Amino acid sequence: MIARAVIGVLGLLAAIVLAACGGDGAGGEPFDLTLDFYVNPDHAGIYTALDRGYFADAGLDLNPQVPSDPSAPIKQVAAGRADLAISYEPEVVLARDQGLDVVAVAALVNGPLTSLISLPEADIASASDLAGKTVVTAGIPYQAAYLDTILGRAGVDPETVDQVDVGFNLMPPVISGRADAMFGGFLNVEGVDLAERGLDPRVVPVDELGVPTYDELVLVADADRVAEDPEPIREFLVALERGTDAAARDPQAATDALVEAGDGLDPELTRAEVDATLPRLVPPGDMPYGWMDPERWQRFADYLYEAGQIESTADAADLLTNDLLPRAREQSG
């Protein structure tokens, strides 16, 4: 997953067991969903739909699985070991570049969550203030490209910034003062956590710092599966839209569903994270639920190519399809 606070091995194993126990159990068609990481507020629509039986209504026995390796979801789908996976737009572009025949079928979070996060005492009012600072990162190559873009736009020599890879454990160095900022934390997770601690974080998503905007989280399927057996995926998306609508109407119920499914989630913090997340789970304007903008995807894929993150140019038409979205079906039928 992209830059989240790390959890221990035992906690992750427990989360795997708990998430795996989330199936509707109504005798529907088995449907395996590989999550991006442990249960978190980005999954509010999923677990609300699961709690209310919407997947069962759609004829699906949903089995959400927490991956043992956060890089595994797309590989699970490509290998036929999952029906859908939650991943990230840049990961889809990278996977296609590496020859994996996968396609994004819906946006789960249609805007960047990845952010530059600092505390007031670091005195970072803008990216130009990063010169001479220590920034902890998750060590993800394309996020390093983001940071290079941001520094270049701000006129900062990357050599003047001490970038330290700490994996997903981004918060402790910032809280302790050993680092001036974190890059890669999510505005609705680390940003909210720091705010709930009363630390008044400055949180700036990457698209406000010069990185082309993109869909942070997407649902990914095997391209052959989409062509040959799309109906279960369509029904999943119908149920997920219902769950997301229900979560937006009743954030406390969404919080309760997440806390019940997750391992050791703090109810108050989870509610704050859910409140920060829900507005980002619905598309802008009148776009269908899950809509992905092909032109925006093309710009982002071109950016990754120009940044040296992929070897060949990518065509957005190969990266995504909006054909399985609920209202896309209504409009075509």
Question: Residue ranges of each PLM-predicted region?
Answer:
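Conserved C-terminal helix/tail region of periplasmic/extracytoplasmic solute-binding proteins
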Residues: W297-G333
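Bacterial N-terminal signal peptides that target proteins for export
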Residues: M1-L10
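Bacterial signal peptide processing site
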Residues: G22-D24
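C-terminal motif of bacterial Sec signal peptides marking the signal peptidase cleavage site
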Residues: V17-A20
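Secondary-structure end/capping motifs
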Residues: A227-A307
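Short, surface-exposed acidic
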Residues: P158-D162, D263-D275, E311-D318
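Short, glycine-/small- and polar/acidic-enriched structural segments
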Residues: G27-G167, M171-N188, V203-P205
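Pocket-lining segment of extracytoplasmic ligand-binding domains
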Residues: P90, N169-P173, R178-G264
